[in-house]
Amino acid sequence: MVTDVAVTRAANIVTVLGGPTALIHLAGWTLLTDPTFDAAGTEYQNGPVMVRKTADPALKPSQLPALDAVVVSHTGHQDNLDTAGRTVASGASKVFTTVAGAKDLGGAAVGLEPWQTRTLSKPGRTPLNITAVPARHGPVGTEAITGPVTGFLLHTDDGSAPTVYVSGDTVDLDAMSALADRYRVDVALLHLGAAGFEEFGDIRLSLTAVQAVEARRLLGDPLVVAVHAEGWAHYTEDRSHVQQLFDAAGVPLHWPTPGQPITLPDPHTR
């Protein structure tokens, strides 16, 4: 009889927990992205803007499996690392983030420069590479306001597991094109929602649906899983709008139900 843990270890699965937060079981490793575990209704003053969480996470921190690593796209915004999420990250044995984020978190956090790779390795497991992908949290010129951010590519040298791109909060399509020039991308967790605030006018700080359709093309048509699109009040494009634009473009989109696992395709397949 195969145990649930063994099944999880053998499968390549993504489980979105809400907002940008996802559990990724890949090549026998378990990773968590951008931990957000505070309760719905929590508000945060972030510089000139207020951010408000509108949905509870699908799992509480106490319900998480053992984590091999946590990847944090940036530490300065609570919709990517809230109070409870920061506690989860601080307690992890391995954390990968931006250089500035590592200084912020301290402890086990490792800051990665663009295109820098670190590898998870243990006896009996396929090594898993974590490569930092350049990102920009808004249009050119907003960097001083938004701060540094990074995406991540999770990949194996032997190609035995699907290659998974976690975009982080970015609208940098040129970086995605550069990523596709370097690596095959089988699955893309794209941070959607077209995040915006009245104080910033028409500036959007994460991908619009139109940008996401183009991002998929540039990345080589991977399976797209929508994250960072529900659960916070500052997302300006809702599910129906995003789905409508993807359907109009004839582009498939996997919109997850929080807490429900998604089995990833085999490498080289769509």
Q: Predicted regions: what is each one?
A:
Residues 2-4, 29-72, 83-86, 139-143, ...:
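Pre-active-site segment of Zn-dependent metallo-hydrolases
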Residues 24, 34, 74, 82, ...:
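Divalent metal-coordination and catalytic microenvironments
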Residues 65-68, 131-205, 256-269:
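Mobile, glycine- and charge-enriched loop segments
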